[in-house]
């Protein structure tokens, strides 16, 4: 009889809102950025690359001042792929600094695999991209898909 009473007491304790609380899942993911911007770089030109990076940092700083976040992706394709190549990037140190200072906003650099494979065939060797570079199948498809998801598009 004692076991039945004890079990009934436990049942009441765990189902009563006054004694037990439901555990809520802990969200370990950072919140989704409030703004999203993709910037295309398709020229092997230091000025164009610097302009794209300036656009990215200006947007990040602007929204930081408003206590808001932004996701920025710089997508390099065609001759612009040199921006993300370890051996030819004229802006690799600046990219590293931007990556380190973007938080809580996010910045991603993506490279068109179609362009990368064509350059590898032409040069007869594999190409190494900057650390953290995301390889996408086709740059134009990446731009299309991000815009379909509501990302704003800029081409310097």
Where are these regions (language model features)?
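Short, glycine-rich nucleotide/cofactor-binding loops
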Residues: 41-53, 86
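Boundary at the C-terminal end of the N-terminal hydrophobic targeting segment
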Residues: 18-20
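A cross-taxonomic marker for long C-terminal extensions/tails that follow the last structured domain
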Residues: 85-156
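Acidic helix-start/capping segments at beta-turn-to-alpha-helix junctions
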Residues: 70-84, 115
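Positively charged n-region of N-terminal signal peptides that target proteins for export
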Residues: 1-4
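Acidic/histidine-rich, surface-exposed loop or edge segments in extracytoplasmic proteins
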Residues: 31-44, 75-79
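Histidine-anchored nucleotide/phosphate-binding helix
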Residues: 50-65
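Bacterial N-terminal signal peptides
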Residues: 7-16
